[in-house]
Amino acid sequence: MGSRYERLQKIGEGSYGVVFRARDVTTGTIVAVKRIRLEKEEEGVPCTAIREISILKELRHENIVRLLDVCHSEKRLTLVFECMEMDLKKYMDHVGGDLDAGTIQEFMRSLLSGVRFCHERNVLHRDLKPPNLLISREKELKLADFGLGRAFGIPVKKFTQEVVTLWYRSPDVLLGSTQYGTPVDIWSVGCIFAEMAIGAPLFTGKNDADQLLRIFQFLGTPNRQVWPSMDTYPNSSNMLSRPEFQQTLAATCEEQFQTNPAYAKLGPQGIDLLRWLLRYEPSERLTAAQALEHPYFSVEF
């Protein structure tokens, strides 16, 4: 880890390395050290790590975890980040999944502020989920784990489809879309918003088809009016011709919004915002900037 950082304890394992809490011996500051093993030296640094480094060096914002230092040796790459108390998933577990209305609103404002900052700089996060949102001791929420993040230019490049943990994946990506932009992050934000209210993930599919079916059960089976581009994706005909997608499912969300007391925490404005984040048609989802202007953020809880 180098003589500058004194290892304290292991706090997690990411997609390509181990994360430790450590002390910067020169300043006494507690930091998070992500150590990335370079399995085959001739291959050098994993491209996912290079991507994360280049993105994070550019992104300086109060709602994005700060990359403080990069140490590179032949066999190891070490990224030093500001240390956060816990991730949103652990935080929700810690409070029994029961976040109060004011905390949900504050976390949503922070989440959308971080996402807006990324999107304005042509960066997609592409893996937004509670374990990748870190909470400080002062209850500030910050975006982390940009391993899948990628700058997007115009024209939109074709991306790999395997992004965003299944439960937070948008219906267009589930149908094989590889040409997408900011709306893929916005769908994930909507899923996280609902999860903070109800204390559990909104859509817990076992595979792509099951995930899509759960979305249809909640929002109702879409038609071409609701989702004009639904037939244009690579897997549309294959997926939507399956027997389980032949029946038209009525939306259960309206009943849940009325009867599930957990949603009452969001209030009518919060439920309206959630509807705009979870739109089938990607171009109809609010942008992060538009979402921050939503009346929900003027409500005092």
From Swiss-Prot:
Keyword Transferase: yes
One Pfam family matching this protein: Pkinase
Subunit description: Forms a stable but non-covalent complex with a regulatory subunit and with a cyclin.
Chain's role: Probably involved in the control of the cell cycle.
E.C. numbers: 2.7.11.22
SUPFAM superfamilies: Protein kinase-like (PK-like)
Family assignment from sequence similarity: Belongs to the protein kinase superfamily. CMGC Ser/Thr protein kinase family. CDC2/CDKX subfamily.
Entry-linked Gene3D superfamilies: Phosphorylase Kinase, domain 1 (3.30.200.20), Transferase(Phosphotransferase) domain 1 (1.10.510.10)
Modification sites for Phosphotyrosine: Y16
Activity regulation information from UniProt: Phosphorylation at Ser-15 or Tyr-16 inactivates the enzyme, while phosphorylation at Thr-160 activates it.
GO cellular component, one term: nucleus
Domain of life: Eukaryota
PROSITE patterns the record matches: PROTEIN_KINASE_ATP, PROTEIN_KINASE_DOM, PROTEIN_KINASE_ST
Catalysis: reaction(s): L-seryl-[protein] + ATP = O-phospho-L-seryl-[protein] + ADP + H(+); L-threonyl-[protein] + ATP = O-phospho-L-threonyl-[protein] + ADP + H(+)
Positions of ATP binding: I11, G12, E13, G14, S15, Y16, G17, V18, V19, K34
Cross-referenced InterPro entries: CDK (IPR050108), Kinase-like_dom_sf (IPR011009), Prot_kinase_dom (IPR000719), Protein_kinase_ATP_BS (IPR017441), Ser/Thr_kinase_AS (IPR008271)
Residues annotated as catalytic: D127
Phosphoserine modified-residue sites: S15
Species in which this protein is naturally found: Trypanosoma brucei brucei
Modified residues (Phosphothreonine): T160
Keywords associated with the record: ATP-binding, Kinase, Nucleotide-binding, Phosphoprotein, Serine/threonine-protein kinase, Transferase
Protein name, entry field: Cell division control protein 2 homolog 1
Molecular function terms, GO-annotated: ATP binding; cyclin-dependent protein serine/threonine kinase activity; protein serine kinase activity; protein serine/threonine kinase activity
Biological process annotations from GO: mitotic cell cycle; protein phosphorylation
